[in-house]
Amino acid sequence: MENGKRILIVDDDDEIRELLEFDIAQSGYFVDTASNGKDGLNKVLNNSYDLVILDVMMPKMNGFDVCKNIRQAKLSIPVLMLTAKGTIDDKTVGFDCGADDYLVKPFDVQEVLLRIRVLLRRNQPQAEPSLSNEILSAGNIEIFPDTLECVIVNKKIKLTPTEFEILYCLMQHFNNAVTLATLLDEVWGYDSDEDVRMLRVHVGGLRNKIEPDSKKPQYLHTVTNVGYKLTPFGE
């Protein structure tokens, strides 16, 4: 294959799985498939992939549980949820399980290919060398790129890859407002109304992890009509 990237598609719908397999392979990727969650997870744990595309509603194991098991195995491989379950609650569950991106069926294959390119680019350490080895500190917050963790007031917190990148971007602009457009560009590389909603879901998940009370943020503040700002506790 031209670019050598390996992608696993896990979906119990034969038509969708075969369509994606054809179009993704035509774009130069090596493609493997699984028709249920249990087989998909087994393939992830026993093979090396650069990205996983997961359906949610599948026999033997649903996509949320597959994603959760991938993260519990300490694998940082990008996970793209591609499913008919498109409510905010569904997306929140997916992101909490460790998904990096979420597209709702029916989908445009070109949109899927765009998301694949962005997720693969984000997962390349050489593209962002500062993310691979620099421990960043601001106020009483430290973040550790090698483990995707942050420490706040001596409390170690495990983050998803996307939560980590959002926090990293905010820490680079510590105590200053960061626009939604800047966050979308630095974390995803593109923006749309759908992506703004996705960003807000991720920010909600990040607040649940780092804030003493996520309903009364002390670190990660919303700046009306602008975006978000990370500050020292209570400011």
Which functions belong to the PLM regions below?
Residues N36-D39, N62-D65:
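Acidic catalytic/metal-coordinating carboxylates
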Residues K5-R6, V118-A177, A181:
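Short, Lys/Arg-enriched segments at the junction into DNA-binding effector domains
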Residues S48-I53, M58:
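Active-site beta3 strand of CheY-like receiver
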